[in-house]
Design a protein with these regions (language model features):
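Short, conserved beta-strand segments within well-ordered enzyme catalytic domains
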Residues: 49, 64-66, 75-79, 105-107, ...
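Alpha/beta catalytic cores of nucleotide-metabolism and tRNA/nucleoside-modifying enzymes
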Residues: 1-46, 288-309, 313-381
Length: 381
């Protein structure tokens, strides 16, 4: 199986599975507890049907959107994700270059494997920064100042990770960062030689945003340990309000799931919220983002940019979310599988296929622009 054989989400997933060591593939692929919310995130779209209009003259399609002051040529962006150079040695550089090519936003995580400055200097597209709030308030301040100095366009504070989700696949496989050379790790290197060769012969793994603060003296740290030991469960609305004031720019909360929290985000001056359950990786049993979208849009959609992620696999999923009132959607696994499968060419192919799906489906819906989409286009079963 090669990149040219990938025509959709499941194909990229399969190619990534073939190329990655099992612990790394399952880190991307897995979720919390029984993975019920993870499964529901995509299945929820199946409970909603599209109602197309015809004879609307749809030769020219404009799928551009503007979110938090950023003009995007397509209504889906590459959500910031951690540890990208573990999945492919080109990591964030591949994702940023591909997003730049397609005129959409990309993000760097606090657990990113390149520095904010390095990415900002090389790519001109809209950039967001996924910020994790740490117990060390000095670290938080340094990270905010570094992001501002790097010219980050959107600060995206993740608010649903005050402790780590119970990701049982990671516990079973022993996933850690950097990839641990245990007996099982050596075995995984051996059965995936090309991944191993690339991992060992390219730039040494690091976490530039955290290198001066994370103790990796024993060589590794588990994701669960990072969340439980370093992130601050005491984070509250007062802390976030201070961050919003300091940032004094586009500020987004990622991980909002309740109307009450959405209203509070408006009150403290946020310019965007991402309706997200972290791809099902945190609280299993929580509602799907798509199911929760409409009531949050109804409550605050005229006061703040409402975005959603979690479960997006198809262009039709994007259109359903936009029809409900989302301004745009974010995707993680949809490009991570492609990154793992083939680096930058993989991410470009994933974005191109998604763009074509959105364009095709807009024509079939009789919509020339995103503004033509509305709830009149939807029926729930």
């Amino acid at each position: 199986m090669r990149l040219k054989d990938c025509h959709g989400f499941s194909d990229f997933r399969e190619l990534a599975r073939r190329r990655l060591p099992s612990p790394i593939f399952n880190y991307i692929d897995g979720a919390a507890d029984d993975e019920t919310t993870y499964d529901r995130n995509t299945k929820s779209f199946e409970e909603c049907d599209l109602i197309p209009n015809v004879l609307r003259g749809v030769e020219n399609i404009d799928m551009s959107v503007t979110i938090m002051g950023q003009k995007l040529d397509m209504p889906i962006y590459c959500s910031p994700t951690a540890l990208q150079r573990v999945f492919h040695h080109s990591g964030e550089h591949a994702v940023a270059a591909a997003a730049d090519k397609f005129g959409t936003m990309f993000g760097v995580s606090s657990l990113g494997t390149v520095s904010l400055t390095e990415v900002r200097e090389q790519y001109n597209g809209p950039q967001c920064y996924q910020f994790y709030f740490h117990k060390d308030r000095g670290l938080n301040q340094v990270m905010l100042e570094n992001a501002k100095a790097a010219g980050v366009d959107v600060m995206m504070l993740t608010v649903d990770t005050i402790t780590g989700g119970n990701r049982e696949r990671d516990l079973r496989t022993g996933f850690s960062i950097p990839f641990k050379l245990s007996l099982n790790g050596i075995f995984q290197f051996g059965i995936k030689p090309m991944w191993a060769l690339n991992y060992l012969t390219h730039k040494k793994f690091s976490l530039p945003q955290l290198d001066d603060f994370v103790d990796m003296s024993d060589g590794t740290i588990s994701i669960g340990k990072y969340f439980s030991d370093m992130l601050d469960p005491c984070m509250n609305w007062g802390d976030v309000a201070k961050m919003v004031d300091f940032w004094d720019g586009q500020f987004c909360l990622k991980g909002i799931m309740s109307v009450e929290d959405a209203k509070k985000a408006v009150e403290i001056g946020c310019t965007g919220i991402v309706i997200s359950n972290h791809g099902g990786r945190q609280l299993d049993g929580s509602r799907s983002s798509f199911d929760q979208l409409s009531e949050i849009v109804d409550a605050v959609g005229d006061q703040i940019d409402v975005i959603m992620d979690s479960g997006i696999q198809r262009g039709s999923h994007v259109l359903k979310a936009l029809s409900l009132g989302a301004k745009a959607v974010g995707g993680g696994r949809f490009y991570l599988y492609a990154l793992a499968a083939a680096g930058q060419p993989g991410v470009e192919r994933a974005l191109e296929l998604m763009r074509l799906e959105i364009e095709r489906d807009m024509r079939l819906m009789g919509a020339s622009s995103i503004s033509d989409l509305s709830r009149d286009n939807l029926r729930f079963r």
